[in-house]
Structure formats: structure tokens, C-alpha cells
């Protein structure tokens, strides 16, 4: 997209932004002759498009469709009116959902959402099943293919799903796990097929089946190949089998191919290669004995992309990879320990040029994005053990100094992976581990390892404590500014920034704030907004790059203070509470030039480092102003990219006379134009950002916004070959 390439697209590698716009769907035949699509109902001409804010690097911040307040209120009132028409309430109104109907009725309960994240969750469910086979020692190779018809196939060389008759259902075991909720081999106990697995509820495969237009499965085991096809959770063919040829009789495993259902998902059915590659890379680090391949097919076979992931070093190599662009204080520390049937695997490293921590937790190879008892165990052990060792070995001389968890974790990259026979996850999407015994096991293991290692390597302890003491001193220097932020109530207008043009609504859920670049754009935005629910905060130039500054410098910066106070962000490090925000929509609105792209990136860096939970809560948005205005007679057309401009001009007669205006700054637009094209909830394009892969996003911010010029230069050089020089705004 031309808009992107004019805005230093290398600064926004991991921002994938999508919005519905027309474009034709592309389909092609499968490379697997045994997996054909027979039903014409599986194809669709539904117009969809994917907008990308950057196409230079793999993306890690993903967009979700935004619903305008007016649209929300309209649909809500319609629902209320419909429900109020029936005053009777009897047994006729009680619905009994059977089979996989609950999944199709409430898909969000099983996959988190019906947007992009839920779409990719389907892939992860099948991929995690293959990983469970690998963790059990039965699979060593997993292949993932993103087909050009928007389907996905995942195959492994594990044992293969059983196909014999199941005594409880009277169906084959294969059909049972595909069509019956809570049917699987991972419930633990003597009858379980796995000692350790990421599956708990026996719903993963059946959920994918329920939410797919079509699903095809091939199982190879016992010298036979079994095949069956499904549509929206129901079998459309019987289970067929044939004897494998002699040269293939030793092969075994499972291959699942599915086409997500367009009736279920609210976004375009389009899998992001980089998102899935990030998850596969993660799994390869966590399972060092497994090779995972990823292939992205194209209509033109010469443009197919193939990658293979294998990391013999495991978590130690993972930490090194994450810290590639940083200055480590010591070699990567790590250990693996088994206690009472559970396995604890931890790797960690401190870096001198990092001012925040990166802590990633996994349970049975499932990424627990909301942490859990394993992360709590590491944090508690680190704080207690480092304080104890520092005082014991007299690295800390003052008796009164006690380093907090924030101090000892500054600059830390830590990965903890646990394998637990009976994991207790919160919800089907498994975002948090709840086993209380895991905290004790992890805490004890980390303490024993660090105590032994650091007593033998006092120089490493000294470097870590020195880094922690610097964090402690910086925290003291920032205390006055922090207390100022804490003492100023976000509800008092007297404490708000002077340039903030607030909205009249006091309900954060319906309020939104536009962070705009400069007084010129701020003036147009203030005049063009809807004062009832839209606030405007103009910035004075570029804000501080907090990636290169400590906490003290950050709190002293006036523009940063304005953001913290104006938005109600609270104090860094404190638990995030969305209800404390003054606005639940924070919209970044900058000019379509290099400076605008830079300011947007600085703001994203600030939000990611200061309060990362803003992305998880769905509060961060990017506004999209038009690039062009095309006037022909009394008609005016606004175009948001070069493709739209070409489409409009191509629709005019050859001898037509028209004028094209290129907008580079928001200040060039009249208030009415800005409202209609960029701020009106009914007509604007608003793109929501969420963190899809925290580890890679963290690494990119470190590379692009950190102090190391050589790393940034190398990153830019590696992207140069993929940029269209004609679209650069020089």
C-alpha cells in the first residue's frame, strides 16, 4: 500500500492492520491429490480485502474490526425491541443445543473471538495436537501448509488418530473426536493416551471441525490409510480405507486440512504467514527434538515460501535469539529439572541496555499470555534469592536497601516452560496457568539453581546486582514525578493537560481520544469532532523515545506526563485496570509522511513499554486519513491508497477533466473534511492494534528504537530490497 511505503514502513514491521474492503478471492487446486475440494459451496465470491500498514517485515500487531458507538447502540436497541415483543416465557423458550451446535452458537467461548485471533486459533488447536504427539515421543516432524485457497493443512508423523469403533458412541474413534465435544485422549489417568499434553477438554479438534465449511482428515496407521470428509461439524462421507503400498506401509501420522467457515468469522478468511511462523518458531524452541516446516502456497508455484524450524539449543537458544540486538551482561543461564512428574525448564539473561523485562511463560508448550503460577514462582524466587545472595556475599553494602521485583528484573529476558500432567488452565483458550503446586516447584527450582550458580560465579552476581542497583536509584529519582502522577486524579479537570480538548461524556466506554500531531492538525480536529464523545490531545513535536531512557527521564518529560494524565494511564508497573482509563478508545492520528510515521512509532513504543495491557484490552487504534481527494465537477472522491486512486481515475472517461489533491498533513484538511473521512464513526477506517506475538514485538522495538545503530542499520538494509522506491516520501 502506497500509504505505508511513504511512511518509513520499516518502523512498523509488526503492525498488521486489516479492514473490510472489496477485492476478489483467489482459489487454486491443492498440491495434495488426496485432499480435493468437491463442493462448489465451499467457494465464495464475497468481496474482502486486507489492508497492511507495513509490508516490509513480518507483522506482530494485529487489527480487529472496530464497531462505532452508533452502530452498537442501534443493534442493541433492535435486540431489546425484538426481545420485548414476547412476554411469555415457558418451556418452549428453553433451547437444548446438541452435538457441536453450542460451538457454532457461541464460537467466542471456544476460540476467543470470531476475528483474526480466533481464526488463527483454529490453526493452533490442530498444531498443538501434533506437538502433543511430539512431546509424548511419537512424532519428530510436523508440516504446515497455508494453501492459496485460504485453507490450512497440518500433518505429523505421530501414531495417527485411532480409527477403530468406539464402544461409547458406536462410531469410529476418529469420527468421535471430530464430532463429540469433550472426547479425546488427554484427560489423564491410566486410560489417557498422553502423560503430558496441552489438551485438556477434548474439544480442540471438534471445535475446528464445527467452525469449518469443510474439513478433510487422513490417518495412516497399521499399514492402512483412512480418509473422511466433514462440513460444519458433520460427516459428509463415510470413513474409507485402503492398504498402503509396500513402500509406504511403515509411514504413520495424521493430516488435517480445513476451510474456515465464512458464516462464522467476521474478518476476511486469510491466514497471516508471519503470525503462524512466529507460533511455529516458538514451538520449535520449546521442543528441540522436533522439526516443523511451514509452506505458504501461491497461485504461482515459483512464489511459494518454505521455511523449516529446528533449534537443538531449546530455551537457551530462544533467549539468545530474543537478545540478539542487546548487550548481554553474561552468558544465558538455564536449567531443566523434573520434580514429582512435572518438568521445569528455565532460561534467563540480563542485558545492560534494556530497561524493562521480557518474561514468557509456557505450560505444556501452550503460551500463557496472562502468566500464571509458573511466572509467579519465577518472580518470587528471583527477588528473594538475589537479595539474599547479594547481602550474603556483601555485594550490597547498605543494610537498609532491599531490591524489589521491578529492580531485579530490569533488563531481564526469562523464559519458563513447565510440563505438568494435569494442568489447570483458565478457559478453553488457556491464557493463564492456575496449578498452585507449580508455583512452589518453580520457586524452589530457580532458587536452588541460582544459588549454586551465582555462588560459583560472583562476577555474574555482581553485574546483575549492579544493574538492579541502577534501577533502584533511577526509581528513587523518579519517585517525585511518579507521586505527582499518582496524586493527580484523572477525574479532576484541573490536573488535565492544558491543550487537551475533553469531551462532555464522562463514560470511558463511549469516549475516545485522538492523539494528533501539532496545533494545526489539533485545530482542525477540535473543530471537526463530535464534542459529545470525542476528545483531542495535540502533541508538541516528537515525544521522548522511552526505549533509550530510564524511568526517571520518562516521568520528567512534559509530553509523556500529558499522555499519562490525559489518558489516565496510572503509574508504570502497577496492575492495569481498564476502568481507570478516561477513554477506552485511544486513537493515534498522524500525518501521512515520514514525521507522522515516526511520531506514531514513538507513541506505540511508549504504550508498549509503559502499559502493554492497553493492547490486550483493545484500547489502541490507528486512524486512517485519506491520501487523495479527486474532484470531478461537483463530485469529490477520497482515496486511502494508490490502488483506490487508480480505480477512481480509471472509471472516468478518457477525456474527463479532474483534479487530484494529495494530503500530506491533517492540517491541510478542512474540519468538515476531517470529520467525514477520518473521525465520523459511520464512515471512517479505524484500525485496532493488539499484540499477537509479545516476544517478537519486544525484539523489534528493541532493534528499531534501541541505542544500537548497527542493529537498526542492518534491519533497514535487510528490508530495502522489499521496498518500492517510487513510493518513498523523500
From Swiss-Prot:
UniProt remark on cofactor binding: Binds two Mg(2+) per subunit. The magnesium ions form salt bridges with both the protein and the DNA. Can also accept other divalent metal cations, such as Mn(2+) or Ca(2+).
Sample GO molecular function, one term: metal ion binding
Localization annotation: Plastid, Chloroplast
Binding of Mg(2+) 1, residues: 517, 591
Pfam families: DNA_gyraseB, DNA_gyraseB_C, HATPase_c, Toprim
Amino acids binding Mg(2+) 2: 591, 593
Coiled coil (UniProt feature): none
Record flagged with keyword Amino-acid biosynthesis: no
Reaction catalyzed: ATP-dependent breakage, passage and rejoining of double-stranded DNA
Cofactor field: Mg(2+); Mn(2+); Ca(2+)
Main enzyme class: isomerase
PROSITE patterns registered for this protein in UniProt: TOPOISOMERASE_II, TOPRIM
Domain of life: Eukaryota
SMART domains: HATPase_c, TOP2c
Record function comment: A type II topoisomerase that negatively supercoils closed circular double-stranded DNA in an ATP-dependent manner.
Subunit-structure text: Made up of two chains. The A chain is responsible for DNA breakage and rejoining; the B chain catalyzes ATP hydrolysis.
Record's protein name: DNA gyrase subunit B, chloroplastic
UniProt organism field: Arabidopsis thaliana
Gene that encodes it: GYRBC
Amino acid at each position: 500500500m502506497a500509504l505505508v511505503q511513504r511512511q518509513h514502513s520499516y518502523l512498523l514491521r509488526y503492525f498488521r492492520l486489516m479492514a473490510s474492503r472489496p477485492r476478489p478471492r483467489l482459489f487454486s487446486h491443492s498440491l495434495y491429490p488426496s485432499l480435493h475440494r468437491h463442493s462448489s459451496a465451499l467457494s465464495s465470491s464475497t468481496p474482502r480485502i486486507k489492508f497492511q500498514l507495513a509490508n516490509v517485515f513480518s507483522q506482530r500487531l494485529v487489527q480487529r474490526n472496530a464497531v462505532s458507538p452508533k452502530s452498537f447502540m442501534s443493534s442493541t436497541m433492535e435486540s431489546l425491541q425484538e426481545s420485548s415483543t414476547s412476554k411469555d416465557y415457558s418451556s418452549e423458550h428453553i433451547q437444548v443445543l446438541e452435538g457441536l451446535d453450542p460451538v457454532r452458537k457461541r464460537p467466542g467461548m471456544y476460540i476467543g473471538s470470531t476475528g483474526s485471533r480466533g481464526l488463527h486459533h483454529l490453526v493452533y488447536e490442530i498444531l498443538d495436537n501434533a506437538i502433543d504427539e511430539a512431546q509424548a515421543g511419537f512424532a519428530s516432524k510436523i508440516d504446515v501448509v497455508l494453501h492459496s485457497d485460504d485453507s490450512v493443512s497440518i500433518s505429523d508423523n505421530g501414531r495417527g488418530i485411532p480409527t477403530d469403533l468406539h464402544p461409547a458412541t458406536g462410531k469410529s474413534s476418529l469420527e468421535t473426536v471430530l464430532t463429540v465435544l469433550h472426547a479425546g485422549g488427554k484427560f489423564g489417568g491410566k486410560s489417557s493416551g498422553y502423560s503430558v499434553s496441552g489438551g485438556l477438554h477434548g474439544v480442540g479438534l471438534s471445535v475446528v471441525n464445527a467452525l469449518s465449511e469443510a474439513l478433510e482428515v487422513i490417518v495412516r496407521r497399521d499399514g492402512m490409510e483412512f480418509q473422511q470428509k466433514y462440513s460444519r461439524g458433520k460427516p459428509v462421507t463415510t470413513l474409507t480405507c485402503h492398504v498402503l503400498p509396500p513402500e509406504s506401509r511403515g509411514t504413520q501420522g495424521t493430516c488435517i486440512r480445513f476451510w474456515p467457515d465464512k458464516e462464522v468469522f467476521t474478518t476476511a478468511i486469510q491466514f497471516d504467514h508471519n503470525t503462524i511462523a512466529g507460533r511455529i518458531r516458538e514451538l520449535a524452541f520449546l521442543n528441540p527434538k522436533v522439526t516443523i516446516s511451514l509452506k505458504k502456497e501461491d497461485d504461482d508455484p515459483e512464489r511459494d515460501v518454505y521455511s523449516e524450524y529446528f533449534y537443538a539449543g531449546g530455551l537457551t537458544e530462544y533467549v539468545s535469539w530474543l537478545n540478539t540486538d542487546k548487550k548481554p551482561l553474561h552468558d544465558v543461564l538455564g536449567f531443566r529439572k523434573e520434580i514429582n512428574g512435572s518438568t521445569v525448564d528455565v532460561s534467563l539473561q540480563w542485558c545492560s541496555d534494556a530497561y524493562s523485562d521480557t518474561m514468557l511463560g509456557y505450560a505444556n508448550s501452550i503460551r500463557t499470555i496472562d502468566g500464571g503460577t509458573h511466572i509467579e514462582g519465577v518472580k518470587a524466587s528471583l527477588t528473594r534469592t538475589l537479595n539474599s545472595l547479594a547481602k550474603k556475599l556483601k555485594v550490597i553494602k547498605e543494610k537498609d536497601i532491599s531490591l524489589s521485583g521491578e529492580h531485579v528484573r530490569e533488563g531481564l529476558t526469562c523464559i519458563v516452560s513447565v510440563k505438568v500432567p494435569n494442568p489447570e488452565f483458565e478457559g478453553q483458550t488457556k491464557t493463564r496457568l492456575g496449578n498452585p503446586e507449580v508455583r512452589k516447584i518453580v520457586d524452589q527450582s530457580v532458587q536452588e539453581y541460582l544459588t549454586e550458580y551465582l555462588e560459583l560465579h560472583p562476577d555474574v552476581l555482581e553485574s546483575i546486582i549492579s544493574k538492579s542497583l541502577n534501577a533502584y536509584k533511577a526509581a528513587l529519582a523518579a519517585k517525585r514525578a511518579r507521586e505527582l502522577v499518582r496524586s493527580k486524579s484523572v477525574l479532576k479537570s484541573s490536573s488535565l493537560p492544558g491543550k487537551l480538548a475533553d469531551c462532555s461524556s464522562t463514560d470511558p466506554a463511549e469516549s475516545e481520544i485522538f492523539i494528533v500531531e501539532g496545533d494545526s492538525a489539533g485545530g482542525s480536529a477540535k473543530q471537526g469532532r463530535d464534542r459529545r464523545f470525542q476528545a483531542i490531545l495535540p502533541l508538541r513535536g516528537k515525544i521522548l523515545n522511552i526505549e533509550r531512557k530510564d524511568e526517571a527521564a520518562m516521568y520528567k518529560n512534559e509530553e509523556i506526563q500529558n499522555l499519562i494524565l490525559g489518558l489516565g494511564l496510572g503509574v508504570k508497573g502497577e496492575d492495569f485496570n481498564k476502568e481507570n482509563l478516561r477513554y477506552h478508545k485511544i486513537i493515534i492520528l498522524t500525518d501521512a509522511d515520514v514525521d507522522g510515521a515516526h511520531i506514531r512509532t514513538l507513541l506505540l513504543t511508549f504504550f508498549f513499554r509503559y502499559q502493554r495491557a492497553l493492547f490486550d484490552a483493545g484500547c489502541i487504534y490507528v486512524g486512517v486519513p485519506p491520501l487523495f481527494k479527486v474532484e470531478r465537477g461537483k463530485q469529490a472522491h477520497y482515496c486511502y491508497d494508490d490502488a483506490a486512486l487508480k480505480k477512481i481515475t480509471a472509471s472516468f472517461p478518457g477525456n474527463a477533466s479532474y483534479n487530484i489533491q494529495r494530503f500530506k498533513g491533517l492540517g491541510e484538511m478542512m474540519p468538515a473534511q476531517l470529520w467525514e473521512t477520518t473521525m465520523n464513526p459511520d464512515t471512517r477506517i479505524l484500525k485496532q492494534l493488539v499484540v499477537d506475538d509479545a516476544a517478537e514485538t519486544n525484539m523489534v522495538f528493541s532493534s528499531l528504537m534501541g541505542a544500537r545503530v548497527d542493529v537498526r542499520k542492518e534491519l533497514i538494509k535487510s528490508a530495502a530490497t522489499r521496498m518500492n522506491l517510487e513510493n518513498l516520501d523523500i
